[in-house]
Structures are given as C-alpha cells and as structure tokens.
Curated annotation (Swiss-Prot):
Organism: Escherichia coli (strain K12)
Family of this protein: Belongs to the UvrC family.
Recorded GO CC terms: cytoplasm; excinuclease repair complex
Taxonomy of the source species: Bacteria, Pseudomonadati, Pseudomonadota, Gammaproteobacteria, Enterobacterales
PANTHER family: UVRABC SYSTEM PROTEIN C (PTHR30562:SF1), UVRC/OXIDOREDUCTASE (PTHR30562)
Function: The UvrABC repair system catalyzes the recognition and processing of DNA lesions. UvrC both incises the 5' and 3' sides of the lesion. The N-terminal half is responsible for the 3' incision and the C-terminal half is responsible for the 5' incision.
Name this polypeptide is given: UvrABC system protein C
Length: 610
C-alpha cells in the first residue's frame, strides 16, 4: 500500500448522522461502499484491534481514503448505497456497477417500441429518459425493466427477420411482437405505457392501473391473467419500496458550499423525478482573495456550460448562496436549455432540507480534504528532507506499459502540494522504436515532455523514473542533451527500482545510474509519497495501454471469448434477441442455447460482465 491511512485523524472529522461511505485503495479505486445510521460509530468499528472477520481485515489493510455522504435518513442511505454499488462495483461489496457523456434510456417510436441505451445526439424518433450517471446504471435499469415490463430490447435488424420467438420470449422477458399472434397490439401498447410512466417517476399511476386490471381480470374469472398481473404489481412494489422519493417529482440539482483555510468545496446533490440519484464533491482551485460568491458563480457556470451538449439541465437549481447575478445566470441557463430554469437561493420545505444536506456534505468533505492535504504536506516535507531540497512543490513520475512490445504507452502523472493533480496527467503513444525497448520508450517520452518551453510554475522539483538504474541513465542523457530556455538543472532526477518480489517497502532509490542506491524505512512518510506517485503512474500507463489495445482489436466483446466462433455467436444472438439480451441473461439462460455448455456459458457470462 502506498500510504498509511490515518484513521484517528479521519474519524475526528466524521459526523454521527446517517449516510453512506466509500473506501478507496491506493490506486484511487472504490473498494467498498457501506451505509450507516451513525457514520462515526460505524466507521470507528473498522479500526478496532479485534476485527469481525478476515475479509474486514483485508479490506482495512487496503484503505487509502474514505469519502462520506451524509443523508437525511437511513432510507436515503440505503438508496444511495445501492446507487454507489451499481456505479463503482466495489471489490469488497456483495455485487448486485462519472461519465461525461451521459447515457439515456431510449424508447423508440417504432410500431412495437424497443428499449435501448443511447448516447450522443438525439436524432432518432422516440423518447429519451435520463440522464443516468453511467452506462452500467442504464444496463441495470434495462435489465430490471425487462423483468417487470417485457417489451422488446432487440435491434431492429433482429426484430424484422424473425420467424419464431427468441429465448427472451420463452423465459418471459419479451412479449414476442416479432411473431404475429403472440401478443395483441393493445397489450403491447399498454406495457409500453407502463414503461413510459415508470421512467417518468409515476410509479403510483402504474400501480393504480395494474391493480384495476387485476381486479377486472379476477371479476371476469380470468385467474391466470390476474395472477400474472399480481406478480407484476409485486415486482413494481419491490423496486419502489427501496427508493426515497420527495413530495414532488421535480428534477433539481442542490448545490452546497463550504470554505475554510483557503479551500472551497462545492457539493452537488442530483435529484431526478424526486429521487436522490447521488452526489459529488468538487474542489475548485481558488486564487487568494477571491470572494465566495465568485467561487459559486464561476463553478455553476463551468459546471453547466462546459460540455453542455452532453449535460441535461434540471428544471431547478438550489444554491447555498445569494448571488448578485442570479437572474443573469438563470436567463443564461434557460437560453441554453431552451426552457425556463429556476435558480433559487431561499427554498422552503423539502427543498430547504436538501440544501441543508448539501451544505453539511460540503463541510464534511472539506474537513476531510483539509486533513488529507495536511498529510500530503507532511510527506512532501519529509521527502524534501531526504533529498536535501529546500521544498518539493511539484513532482512528476513516468512509467512504460506494453504487451510483448506492442502498443507501447508511457504515462506521466503529476503531484503538487495537495497530492495528485489528475487534470495534468498525460499519456504518450510511443512509436518508431524496437518492440519491447523500454529504454528507448523512456528516452522518447522525456524528450517529448521536456524538450519544449515550460512555464516556470510547471517545472518539477523532482522527476521520478520508475525502473531503476537503466531508465535513470536514459533520463540523465536526455536532460544533458536538452536545449531549452528553462532551467533544466532544477529538477532532481530520482530512479526507483522495485525490491525483491516487487514488494512495497523494499524499493531502492538512485540519484545516479552508477553505484549503490539507498532505501528508506517502510514507515517513512517520504517513501509513502514515492510509492503513491509511482503506483499512480503505473495505473495510468496500464489504463492507457488497455484502451489502446482495445482500440487496435476493434472486435466485438463476443469475438474475444475463446470457444465462441461465428456459428455460436450467431446462435447466441439469435436466441437472446441481440447482444443486449445476452448481456442481461444469467448463466443458466445462456446454457439453454443449443451448442453452449454450462462451462462455456459461465465463461461467456463473466466475459460480458467484466
């Protein structure tokens, strides 16, 4: 683990209110999401001397950071926990998975409408519901809808060319409009209307209509039909009982603000159709002397106006600050949306409670952030002492990733006095070298990064070279040959070689390519910050390499599964009604397809899920 998590300092910042917490590992990945009636009491239980299970011990050993979101009630905490688990798919949760390109659920305008996920411009005829936080949330919702309201989700090309119903019909997840006589036009249209109402947040109307139909069927002695509708009613109720819904079904964003020690936190609650979908904290960079009103006004403008093509504005925005140009802001947003957008600063009732909640979350997140910042400062001070530098304000670290020499990617990550500066992370595609030549790759990325004009504020104090003596020698050669206007002698070049068995804490550091290196104690704060930036660089390189490799393959997810050739692909898609139906199918359902064994069904299931 790159850093020792200071549980004692963190717990001092935690409230005793109900809420949800997210635990992160050293790579910034959410590894656990939980809920609590009392956040302080629950989180304190993780750091006792005697833990409940080995799983908890393994979890706690990997904790790098914890974020909390305060909620009004336990019910809200339950909903939020569920949303976060679907979003992050944490490793230590029982799994039931921020996308700038917000996906929608699309209900087509066909004679027999279909449901599908949609991204981008809304050209196709039909209705769009959303936005959803990410693609996984859409797929989960589509799978849920398919179980409750069995309208088709297959591609039109599949739908138009069927002579008999697919497996989705056989297992009760599609009414089979592709084959004449399986479902009446009226029944299919009714199910489509239920979907429309459900996605619009009108769950009560759906239940009212279903109950009425069930009673009518029962009175007409159509007991089988009444039982089917009863099951549908129960399915809808199971879903709606888990959701916290406000008295109004409006769409609104609630923005709370906290400011302390020169740092601001803006916390946004996202509420759609009266349901809390989630929340997020933002920490805008605040120049000295800036008024808080300017921070809020600038943030709101950037948040809604940048990337506006992919962002859907809510009908109302609640602000934790009385802005001088509130009318101007509302008019600008209304013009952008093509409809009236209200910006309110003094709400009442439920809206006032939401604003108080956003304010509480902003203050909690800011307190936690300031505590983390203090820890980073201590580690950088310790590193400066080890390296005999006056201070370390900026560090950059490089790593190389490839597969058997192909699709080589170099990463550069940046840390400043506050820790990771992710907006300045960069990836470089390496070309024109001998496959697998990491030295040439390092040489190339350093020349591209530093062989140009650099602003004085962007000159690093330390450049960390992951790979030991050989890579450090490349860096020294590159810097010796640089012909630049900035002070190329300012950065200290530091090589890092992994220890025996590549275990954290056994790293060897090098100032020069020749001679012996030196090591730091495993509990050294200076070593922790070196491990942290090194791990960030490695993860960033691996992530870039995976994207490049996936792009090069340019094949469907089915084509990558061993044992699934063209005939089996065709059979799977035919019986499941397309790839979406296959993604939503269980192992048992996949195994029913002719030619697919239980073992292959499991392989297909997990390949599509991951």
């Amino acid at each position: 683990m790159s850093d020792q998590f200071d549980a004692k300092a963190f717990l001092k910042t935690v409230t005793s209110q109900p809420g949800v917490y997210r635990m992160y590992d050293a790579g910034g990945t959410v590894i656990y999401v939980g809920k609590a009636k009392d956040l302080k009491k629950r989180l304190s239980s993780y750091f006792r001397s005697n833990l409940a299970s080995r799983k908890t011990e393994a979890l706690v050993a990997q904790i790098q950071q914890i974020d909390v979101t305060v909620t009004h009630t336990e019910t809200e905490a339950l909903l939020l926990e569920h949303n976060y688990i679907k979003l992050y798919q944490p490793r230590y949760n029982v799994l039931l998975r921020d996308d700038k390109s917000y996906p929608f659920i699309f209900l087509s305008g066909d004679t027999h409408p279909r449901l599908a996920m949609h991204r981008g411009a809304k050209h196709a005829k039909g209705e769009y519901f959303g936005p959803f936080p990410n693609g996984y949330a859409v797929r989960e919702t589509l799978a849920l809808l398919q179980k409750i309201f069995p309208i088709r989700q297959c591609e039109n090309s599949v739908y138009r060319n069927r002579s008999r119903p697919c497996l989705q019909y056989q297992i009760g997840r599609c009414l089979g409009p592709c084959v004449e006589g399986l479902v009446s036009e009226e029944e299919y249209a009714q199910q489509v209307e239920y979907v429309r109402l459900f996605l619009s947040g009108k769950d009560d109307q759906v239940l009212t209509q279903l109950i009425s139909r069930m009673e009518t069927a029962s009175q007409n002695l159509e007991f089988e039909e009444a039982a089917r509708i009863r099951d549908q009613i129960q399915a809808v109720r199971r879903v709606t009982e888990k959701q916290f819904v406000s008295n109004t079904g409006d769409d609104l964003d609630v923005i709370g603000v906290a400011f302390d020690a020169g740092m601001a936190c803006v916390h946004v609650l996202f509420i759609r159709q009266g349901k809390v979908l989630g929340s997020r904290s933002y920490f805008p960079k605040v120049p000295g002397g800036t008024e808080l009103s300017e921070v809020v006004e600038t943030f709101v403008g950037q948040f809604y106006l940048q990337g506006s093509q992919m962002r859907t504005l809510p009908g109302e925005i609640l602000l934790d600050f009385n802005l001088s140009d509130k009318t101007l802001l509302a008019d600008s947003l209304s013009e952008l949306a093509g409809r009236k957008i209200n910006v309110q600063t003094k709400p009442r009732g439920d809206r006032a409670r939401y604003l108080k909640l956003a304010r509480t979350n902003a203050a909690t997140a800011l307190t936690s952030k300031l505590s983390q910042q203090s820890t980073v400062h201590q580690r950088l001070t310790a590193l400066a002492s080890v390296l005999k530098l006056p201070e370390v304000k900026r560090m950059e670290c490089f790593d190389i990733s490839h597969t058997m020499g192909e699709q080589t990617v170099a990463s550069c990550v940046v840390f400043d006095a506050n820790g990771p500066l992710r907006a300045e992370y960069r990836r470089y595609n390496i070309t024109g070298i001998t496959p697998g030549d990491d030295y040439a790759a390092m040489n190339q990325v350093l020349r591209r990064r530093y062989g140009k004009a650099i602003d004085d504020s962007k000159i690093p104090d330390v450049i960390l070279i992951d790979g030991g003596k050989g890579q450090l020698a490349q860096a020294k050669n590159v810097f010796a040959e640089l012909d630049v206007s900035w002070d190329k002698n300012h950065p200290l070049l530091l090589g890092v070689a992994k220890g025996a068995d590549r275990k954290a804490g056994l790293e060897t550091l090098f100032f020069e390519p020749e001679g012996e290196g030196f090591s730091l104690p495993p509990d050294s704060p200076a070593l922790h910050v070196i491990q942290h930036i090194r791990d960030e660089s490695h993860d960033h390189a691996i992530g870039g390499h995976r994207k490049k490799r996936a792009k090069v393959k340019n094949t469907s997810s089915l084509e990558t599964i061993e044992g699934v050739g063209p005939k089996r692909r065709q059979m799977l898609l035919k019986y499941m009604g397309g790839l979406q139906g296959l993604r939503n199918a269980s192992v048992e359902e996949i195994a029913k397809v002719p030619g697919i064994s239980q073992g292959l069904a499991e392989k297909i299931f997990w390949s599509l899920k991951h």
